[in-house]
Amino acid sequence: MNNIQKGIKEDFGIEFANQDLLLEAFTQGNYLNEHPEEKGRDYQRLEFLGDSVMQLIVADYLFTRYPAWEEGQLTEMRIAMVQSKSFSHFARLAGFNRYIRLGKGEELSGARNRDSLLEDIWEAFIGALYKDQGAKAVFTFLNKAFFPAIDEGFFEEFIDYKSKLQELLQKAGSVDIEYKVENEDLSDPQKPHFEVTVFVNDKAIGSGSGRSIKIAEKRAAKKAYQDVTPR
């Protein structure tokens, strides 16, 4: 068992039947140039596959979990979830940067922690897991390492509902939009909680809560935007 397989098994309980796929997912092209004795490929083909797999699995997850959401809501969240900035974040959380096989020059340049490479490696791993074990295994992995971030408000960072709400409301003319903190609970410093309501011309149109005022405001804007968007 190679070190990559050992780490992935310890962290996620995943054991690849085809360990060559796993090595390929973590192999950068310059590494192969410096190790001509290795006959494998770099990660790029698996990255191509993983991109499509992520699109499908995330779309299916959202479709199943949110039966009341309209197509526009599903699309907005899917776009937020499958963009590259989120992939680099989760690749770091999963510790994937430890396993990348880099050429010496890339190692010295700091590529191991480069967002663009980590984004690619995340997709390549997803592609490798799909080829080795199928969509169900990918879903199980994402359910542990990716989907919980929805409830943590992580992906809302990539959807600017405050701007979307402002643009929608101002189509009818000038309006006064205000966000007010209605309640806050700081009893547990590790789990602060804020409740925010958004007002338009002194009328409440949406509320939201979260671990920070910023997240609560975004959720209030999201609720208001979804309620006032024409169906």
From Swiss-Prot:
Biological processes per GO annotation: mRNA processing; regulation of gene expression; rRNA processing; tRNA processing
Protein's name according to its UniProt entry: Ribonuclease 3
Annotated ranges, domain DRBM: 160-230
HAMAP family in the cross-refs: RNase_III
All copies of domain RNase III, residue ranges: 5-134
GO molecular function annotations of the record: double-stranded RNA binding; metal ion binding; ribonuclease III activity; rRNA binding
SMART domains assigned to the protein according to its UniProt record, in alphabetical order: DSRM, RIBOc
Enzyme class, broadest EC rank: hydrolase
Cofactor(s) this protein cannot do without: Mg(2+)
Residues annotated for Mg(2+) binding in this entry: E47, D120, E123
UniProt similarity note: Belongs to the ribonuclease III family.
Coiled coil (residue ranges): none
InterPro entries in alphabetical order: dsRBD_dom (IPR014720), RNase_III (IPR011907), RNase_III_dom (IPR000999), RNase_III_sf (IPR036389)
Gene designation per UniProt: rnc
Localization of this protein: Cytoplasm
NCBIfam families hit by this protein: RNaseIII
Keywords, alphabetical: Cytoplasm, Endonuclease, Hydrolase, Magnesium, Metal-binding, mRNA processing, Nuclease, RNA-binding, rRNA processing, rRNA-binding, tRNA processing
